[in-house]
């Protein structure tokens, strides 16, 4: 370090002390404890200096032990002398313990600490000791409140190695370590034990536990020429320029996307996108729009999907589709997708473009309704005035588990489903309050500020059913699957009417995809045995509805799918798989699906190379271009 830095750190701050400091500095130089780098005008420790410093530290620590005084390395990044007052203060303020009891526990902790004869005493070690005393004394309720959240050193070290392989960099490492703490906080503090036990046992599943209590899953945001972003910004987002972008709708959209994508967990749906794209826009400009939206989205492993609503009647539809086609060709895993509303108006000569987009891993959904919005994951929502709502879901029921517990009894299956639904509903009620508090506290500043973009006072609460088809196969009944589903869902819908106690939320079922499918099957293998589960499913339970070329011609499959869509009010994720390798057949499948369903999305089963990013079809195990590992776009 420099002369002035060294002087300040040594405590010689006044000018009149400069001579005294220079005297001591010369002494250290003569004894070869420090050396001077004349070129950089800096001083550094020599090898002898380090040896002397380490020896001095050891002597100091031993002297502390001999004197009976102990110093604690606290979580405030300071060395503090050990005193029982800090333990008493923590027990009283954090755990709510009576003072006399806290003094007794602190005294016991002190006697044990002095028996340790350790020179390296830390705050976490003292807390662990106090918690062990509380357990021994049967004071479990206080121990629970005194728990310390965090990760073991080994796990943090492993995270450094693992996160780098994902390609998201240092932000992903920070997110993963933060998620670990927030997950523990949710399960230990914010949720009651019965809901936590249901999640841990596999009866229900809470997705992305680290973010579950922080952010909404899906936000339906309105963006049009009347959205007044900068007029409401006031003292928030001080790092954002205060330009007047009222007449620059695409710049306005980029600003909204930059701020809002940080506050949404799963998907951000922009209603009215095609209305703000100029009619005379060309394909190159459309590609630039998609690039800007990609670059202004939060870039880490929590990146939400961006869905842009496009009206099939728009004069710029062709250019938007062609621009999106070029965008997905250049992007291995596009996080931007198009939701085409009023899709029955699409001209058939555009089906070729839709197919090509899907073959390049693009995300296209077709919605014949122009008033009901449908997200990429199949969630339904309607505008309230001009503003869209938030969706809070991420709670899934393990339907095969319910069927296995019912042991082929149809009546018990329905009753058990309704019983598990109570836990799911209670979890969502708590989540709604937690996120509302986050909005009030300013933790979600965009959502709390911009009332003409997001409806913050009204939430759609959604419970997902995972493995419904496997569950129906397990229920031994003379009734058809359609009848069992009808009676079960109608019973749940009636129950939902009784629990929507206020006018600011509503409950509904969904059939969508999340991370519960693989977790449920693993937990069920542990509970019921691998051989029993093997006959039900292999790697994951079914989610949503997948339709291929053969299914489109299957009347019973179509009838069953239509019934599910009719019954399940929250939305059904219907996906049409383009897998025939015959473009004419696939175009006919799209046309037929449009005549059968009000909503579906298009997918093609692809594999993307993790090394070169190229896309390839077919049953291949390694990249055909560079022999790299492959990632499936849909699993």
Annotate each language-model stretch with its function.
Residues 61-168, 455:
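Charged, amphipathic alpha-helical regulatory modules used
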Residues 29-39, 501-507:
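A short, conserved structural fragment
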Residues 14-30:
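Short amphipathic alpha-helical interaction segments
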Residues 39-60:
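Short, cationic-aromatic polyanion-contact patches
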Residues 163-457, 478, 482, 486-633:
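Conserved catalytic cores of very large enzyme subunits
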Residues 455-472, 631-635:
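Conserved phosphate/anionic-ligand binding catalytic regions in large, soluble enzymes, centered on
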Residues 8, 23, 128:
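DNA-binding alpha-helical recognition surfaces that contact promoter or target DNA
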């Amino acid at each position: 370090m420099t002369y002035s830095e060294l002087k300040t750190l040594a405590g010689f701050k006044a000018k009149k002390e400069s001579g005294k400091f220079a005297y001591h500095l010369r002494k250290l130089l003569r004894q070869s404890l420090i050396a001077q780098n004349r070129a950089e005008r800096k001083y550094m420790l020599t090898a002898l200096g380090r040896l002397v410093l380490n020896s001095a530290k050891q002597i100091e620590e031993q002297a502390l032990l001999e004197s009976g005084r102990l110093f604690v390395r606290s979580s405030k990044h300071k060395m503090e002398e050990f005193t029982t007052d800090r333990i008493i203060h923590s027990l009283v303020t954090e755990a709510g313990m009576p003072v006399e009891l806290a003094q007794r526990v602190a005294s016991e902790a002190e006697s044990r600490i002095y028996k340790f004869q350790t020179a390296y005493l830390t705050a976490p070690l003292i807390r662990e000791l106090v918690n062990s005393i509380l357990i021994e004394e049967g004071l479990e309720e206080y121990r629970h409140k005194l728990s310390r959240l965090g990760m073991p050193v080994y796990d943090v070290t492993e995270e450094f190695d693992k996160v780098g392989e994902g390609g998201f960099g240092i932000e992903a490492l920070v997110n993963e370590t933060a998620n670990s703490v927030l997950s523990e906080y949710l399960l230990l503090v914010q949720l009651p034990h019965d809901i936590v036990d249901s999640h841990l046992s596999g009866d229900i599943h809470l997705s992305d536990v680290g973010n579950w209590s922080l952010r909404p899953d899906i936000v339906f945001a309105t963006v049009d020429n009347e959205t007044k972003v900068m007029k409401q910004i006031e003292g928030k987002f001080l790092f954002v320029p205060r330009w007047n972008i009222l007449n620059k709708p695409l710049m306005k959209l980029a600003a909204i996307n930059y701020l809002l994508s940080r506050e949404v967990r799963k998907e951000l749906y922009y209603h009215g996108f095609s209305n703000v794209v100029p009619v005379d826009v060309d394909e190159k400009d459309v590609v630039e729009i998609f690039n800007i939206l990609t670059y202004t989205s939060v870039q880490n492993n929590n990146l939400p999907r961006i869905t842009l609503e496009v009206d099939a009647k728009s004069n710029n539809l062709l250019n938007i589709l062609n621009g999106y086609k070029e965008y997905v060709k250049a992007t291995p895993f596009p996080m931007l997708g198009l939701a085409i509303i009023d899709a029955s108006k699409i001209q058939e000569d555009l089906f070729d473009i839709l197919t090509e987009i899907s073959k390049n891993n693009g995300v296209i959904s077709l919605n014949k309704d122009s008033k009901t919005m449908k997200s990429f994951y199949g969630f339904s929502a309607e505008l309230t005035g001009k503003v869209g709502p938030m969706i809070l879901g991420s709670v899934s029921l393990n339907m095969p588990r319910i069927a296995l517990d019912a042991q082929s009894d149809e009546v018990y299956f329905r009753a058990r489903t309704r019983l598990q639904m109570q836990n799911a509903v209670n979890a969502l009620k708590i989540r709604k309050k937690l996120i509302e508090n986050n909005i009030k506290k300013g933790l979600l500043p965009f959502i709390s500020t911009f009332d003409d973009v997001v409806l913050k006072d009204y939430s759609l609460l959604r419970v997902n059913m995972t493995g419904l088809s496997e569950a129906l196969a397990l229920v031994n009944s003379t009734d058809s699957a359609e009848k069992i589903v009808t009676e079960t869902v109608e019973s749940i819908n009636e129950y939902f009417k009784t629990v929507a106690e206020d006018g600011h939320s509503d409950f509904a079922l969904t059939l969508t995809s999340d991370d519960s499918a693989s977790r449920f099957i693993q937990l069920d293998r542990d509970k019921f045995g691998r051989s029993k589960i093997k006959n039900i499913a292999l790697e994951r339970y079914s989610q949503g509805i997948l339709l291929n070329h053969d299914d489109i011609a299957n009347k019973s499959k179509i009838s069953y799918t239509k019934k599910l869509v009719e019954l399940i009010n929250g939305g059904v994720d219907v996906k049409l798989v383009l897998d025939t390798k015959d473009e004419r057949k696939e175009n006919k499948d799209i046309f037929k699906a449009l005549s059968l369903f009000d909503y579906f999305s298009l997918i093609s089963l692809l594999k993307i190379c993790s090394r070169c990013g190229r896309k390839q079809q077919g049953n291949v195990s390694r990249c055909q271009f560079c022999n790299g590992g492959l990632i499936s776009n849909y699993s």
